[in-house]
């Protein structure tokens, strides 16, 4: 409810009645709903989400080029003033970001797949390392390190994100569970007729999926 507090503090009758309020939270439907239900001046609120960050937080982790050529999602809503939307867009452009417009629900469905579930998967895999012998961990290559890098993220932040975007995450996780069940069933009987073909199909589907990702941060491959 920080957006509601900001709106009540700055606009329309606070110290800065002409202020535009935005947020950079990782979930957009919940803040928008809170603003609309609060009775605050929703016309000056425009949700946004710069798709940039690191697994570390705080001033020490700051980078001057953090937003350069990164997507910045702006979630316009029916009550938002046009000039407020333009101001938030101008902020993103000034910081070097590439602006994308989505509704709050489109945003949350999208980031569930491209950000929130990857965080969950990385953390789950890293969990398996807790009791792994040190000699085995010393052999870990870049593949494992890349996969679990974001498992070092702040749990306090991600607990809030997961809880706020639970429904879209669950839909994606159910699909992943079906794929995992399929893989497990095949590996439990790897010499069965068609088992190798099924494994190849799973890998091919992964190849097809990763090939659809554009170049880094939305730029040309």
Question: Which residues does each PLM region occupy?
Answer:
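Short, amphipathic C-terminal "tail helix"
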Residues: 200-221
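Internal alpha-helical scaffold of NAD(P)-dependent oxidoreductase catalytic cores
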Residues: 64-152
């Amino acid at each position: 409810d920080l957006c509601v507090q900001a709106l009540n503090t700055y606009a329309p009758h606070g110290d800065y009645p002409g202020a535009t309020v935005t947020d950079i939270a990782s979930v957009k439907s919940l803040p928008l709903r809170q603003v609309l239900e609060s009775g605050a001046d929703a016309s000056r609120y425009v949700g946004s989400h710069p798709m940039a960050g690191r697994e570390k937080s705080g001033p020490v982790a700051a980078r001057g080029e953090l937003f350069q050529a990164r997507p910045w999602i702006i979630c316009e809503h029916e009550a938002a003033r046009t000039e407020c939307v333009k101001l938030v867009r101008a902020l993103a452009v000034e910081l070097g970001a590439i602006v994308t417009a989505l509704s709050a629900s489109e945003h949350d469905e999208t980031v569930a797949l491209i950000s929130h579930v990857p965080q969950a998967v990385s953390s789950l895999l890293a969990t398996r390392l807790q009791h792994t012998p040190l000699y085995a961990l010393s052999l870990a290559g870049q593949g494992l390190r890349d996969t679990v890098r974001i498992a070092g993220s702040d749990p306090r932040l991600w607990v809030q994100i997961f809880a706020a975007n639970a429904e879209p995450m669950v839909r994606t996780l159910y699909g992943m569970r079906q794929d995992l069940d399929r893989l497990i069933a095949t590996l439990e009987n790897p010499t069965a007729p068609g088992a190798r073909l099924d494994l190849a199909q799973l890998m091919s589907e992964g190849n097809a999926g990763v090939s659809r990702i554009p170049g880094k941060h939305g730029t040309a491959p």
